[in-house]
Amino acid sequence: MQFKRVTFMLIVILFAVQTAGARDYDRQLLRRVMNYAEPYLSDFPDSLVSNTYLKGHIKILRRNFTLAAIPTMFYLLRDGKREFFFESYSKQIFHDRKNVKTIQNILISTIYHRHKTLNNVVEYLSPQLYQTQLFKNGILSPVRNSNRKYYRYKTEMINDSLAIITFKSKLQNTQLLRNGLLNVNRITGRIISFQFEGEYDMVRFSVSGKMGEKGIQTLYPSNCHIFSSIKSFGNHLHATFDAYYNLPITLPDTIQNSEDRELMNSLRPIKLNMTELAIMAEYDSINSKSKNTLAKTKKKRKGIKYFLWNILGENMLHKIHVSTVDKRGKIRINPLLNPLYLGYNHRRGLTYKFDLRGGYDLTNNSNFSGRVKLGYAFRESKLFYTFTSRYNFNKRRNGYVELEFSNGNRIVDSRVLDEVKRVDNIDSINWDAMNLDYFKDLKSKVAFNYDIINKRLGMKSGFIIHRRSAVDKEGFKRAGRTSNYKSFAPFISVSWYPLTNDYPLVFTSQYEHAMKIFGGNFRYDKMEFDGQYIHHLPCLRSLSLRGGLGFYLDKRGETQFLDYSNFKENYIPHGWYDDWSGEFELLNPNWYNASDFYMRFNLTYESPLLLLTWMPYFGRIIEKERLYASSLGIQKLSPYTEIGYGFTTRVFSMGIFTGFSPKHFEGFGIKLGLELFENW
């Protein structure tokens, strides 16, 4: 009996030791794989160049008219076809592992006007396995040690030099891969090949590929394949893409957007399959017939069909990208009519926004740029605009001259300050009963900026002109009061970047002095100080901090307008990635002009896996969540506090806020923004 007990104990101990040893070895192997890139990342070259071949096959299984509203999908409706193919050969230059410049040498496409499509899916062909984010827009990489807590791993030893690591996400969320496997070298930890599945931004995908074999190329795929399924508004598409990197032949930069098929045949690393050849043959047949009937159809091109496809489609429902012949100038215009640019704010109601950008490179260190931002608030029936033009004469030292013209919110004069001072209890404030005088505000700004200490200390100077006119001019005339006011104020601003402007930490101070010259009606001195910092945490988390104060030193004139640069209402709410953090969502807009000083503090915590993420089903579609906390001190309202919670999904973003002061509760408010196809 004693012998049996001893034998049993030895077996248990031996099994435990073997199990522990195997588990430790699994950890060691996983650690070796995750740390493999460190020697290369610490000595990363300034740039990497890759000759890349890309091909794609798109098949429409089900479609309806809403397909036209999906970015780059409009042209798939043009010819009534259901299958499309394109291939390209290009030179890609990778800078700092993030910025990629692409020179497209050859493009062959059966899509209308030789377009490419689904660029957001094409990005999945370049997974950054060793980065926190697998792709540019998201998804936590299972090879990053900081993301390890979100995945379960298993290891299978194939032989003395090879092993397979399988992984699966611990919860279903769009920021995590569902499952996958890695073929790795047991000795070095190098990933030989990979395979994984996931779903992000309405794209369900399966990716497989092989990694490079030597040096820093082992951090990147040498070839990659993706199969994706896209379902949206009743439309269903399948898209297959293949990419081959580091090909030996480099074409001269003078060859761009060529349609030379013979040249492509000599460069293509793999043969086209039967389906792809059939699509090309059908496309050539249709083109041949079109050329034969060109004379007959030329007159018909001015009809309604031509207008819908070429005028309405290209300019109203589709993003417009225009380049000059020398490729130095570019114009980018968002769709003129697109319901996806609608937003909602509890105070302004429904809003619509529009954005146009353009630029021209003079040299590598100088350029012209311009931007037009428009927004329409339906509840107020008001159009807001900002026109900005800039001449960058020294980009390396952030040297530029900028002109800006804009109209903002209706503003009240300093009489509101006098009214507020008479009130003893904030609960008794009735803004409507004050009969405040409202003014339209037109703003012009000229600024000169230059980094005195490169990337650390910048100085901006210029002047600001405000032209304010009364909304009710007849009432001013009857009262014998001036209905138009103008201010001319030179300013100087200093920005300090303690860690250089490559890091999100900046302190800014600005002094503004209004003078009674050039038609100015009054004088004032104003100071503002502002500090902003974003602390990036592991796993796509971040903590944003902002604090500031402002005050008027001197005010002289018939009337005054208390108007701050860093404490004002954003009159057109944008999406998740704009100014959701650092704003006061429930504060009555009259308070922005009712105090001759302010102190503010804003804190925002962002994480892809926070609260709702852990809820069944709903947590699957949550991309990121935020917690907000803001505090404000102004005349008669100190302290005022807002707290809120927000989240964004593939379709929309939403924020819920509440605000209160020691003697008053502001209630609750919501903010909505459409994020559909934001990353497409």
Listing of model-derived features with the role each one plays in the protein:
Residues Y352-G358, F387-Y391, V446-I452, F463, ...:
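Residues on the lipid-exposed face of transmembrane beta-strands in outer-membrane beta-barrel proteins
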Residues Y400-D418, S428-M434, N501-D502, V506-L609:
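C-terminal outer-membrane beta-barrel translocator/porin domains of Gram-negative envelope proteins
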Residues R348-Y352, S381-Y385, K440-S444, T482-P490, ...:
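Residues that define the transmembrane beta-barrel architecture of outer-membrane proteins
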